[in-house]
């Protein structure tokens, strides 16, 4: 084998086919075998992001995949991140740093520049690791996106790597998805596809076998395995909000999250989804905010626009009513900014330049600035002095007298966020609060839950990554997979 590592790419017939999950599974499976493996996604479009060890920003799916590889997240793992901030545009992040915002047409022309960043990152990873496990984006068969593609076959052709194609049988039409995708590829791209993985199968595999035999005969390519449907697997969603709940018994704390048009980092709420004593509700447009113990205003990629949407839906009045009845209110990142008195965007970073009135629940004002704050932090919650870890991803600078009552004191001595005088309203810039067991328990007690069961979310995520690797061992053709990775079979 050459000094450079081997590259294997997972592409999907559709969005949500299981690419992120399969890459996570393969990464941990190889890591357990002692293989130096690293995840890579050339281009990601998502509002869920993570802060890296080198002080940049990547998609959260790649951060989970890094954990599967037993590595710290690094910006080379996701060199191009697109964070939508309007219906037709997105903030472009290259090597972890925001470069500019573009509409779709401008970005299409920019792809040649983006590809240089992609190939530079891949080259560094291939030089440092034995296997680079790559995740594609969406589908390689999107005809309108084929020109200058950097996310799927355009990348695979550029680095000359084999491809596995995964499809979700649970949504139906799996054979049409697989065969149709192949038909829409060029001859050279079709040759790169070395096998199929069918995901989320329920039932008797013997009943599926005739279809698998037909697929192999029709395409001349092997089925590398069929992964079962796993209903209780809980890893961060790349983009869509995961509303599944763990089994709940006994008294539960009611937590409501208003879903704003540009909600970001909604993975903040995954620990609450899984907590056996929390009933978590995401409330969308056209719905009234139900009665709750705690309302959480989430992060936002376009805070002033989302604040306007919140008012249009009448949720501002519902929040004030909630507080009058003794409920608790928490704002995270953009949610903190909404809690203040004014929000200023003089540079037009999130849309038209200007200022907006906040909800006026904390004596704060925020000004958006070009330099984004990206940090992994540790500190203590003002409630119960509970230790916590989290991360900052924001462009706002917040000032005001409410900061004299911080929500968090960080280990570097900085104060973060604020609390109201009556203690019913709290805001923080820190994402990931609920992942820290002690901080999560303290927040739930603050919101009214008397006897809190401690849940170790980090341990749950690690357990599920291990389960995924077990599924690879049991259900996939590991010999063929090792060959594709250039690894010995023994």
From Swiss-Prot:
InterPro entries: Class_I_gatase-like (IPR029062), CobQ/CobB/MinD/ParA_Nub-bd_dom (IPR002586), CobQ_GATase1 (IPR033949), CobQ_N (IPR047045), CobQ_synth (IPR004459), GATase_3 (IPR011698), P-loop_NTPase (IPR027417)
SUPFAM superfamilies: Class I glutamine amidotransferase-like, P-loop containing nucleoside triphosphate hydrolases
Pfam families given in the database record: CbiA, GATase_3
Source superkingdom: Bacteria
Any one GO biological process: cobalamin biosynthetic process
Pathway assignment: Cofactor biosynthesis; adenosylcobalamin biosynthesis
MF terms (GO), sorted A to Z: ABC-type vitamin B12 transporter activity; catalytic activity
Intrachain S-S bonds: none
PROSITE patterns to which the protein is assigned, alphabetical: GATASE_COBBQ
Residues covered by the GATase cobBQ-type domain: 252-439
Positions of the catalytic residues: 333 (nucleophile), 431
Keywords assigned by UniProt, alphabetized: Cobalamin biosynthesis, Glutamine amidotransferase
HAMAP family named among the record's database cross-references: CobQ
Function in brief: Catalyzes amidations at positions B, D, E, and G on adenosylcobyrinic A,C-diamide. NH(2) groups are provided by glutamine, and one molecule of ATP is hydrogenolyzed for each amidation.
Family the entry assigns: Belongs to the CobB/CobQ family. CobQ subfamily.
Name of the featured protein: Cobyric acid synthase
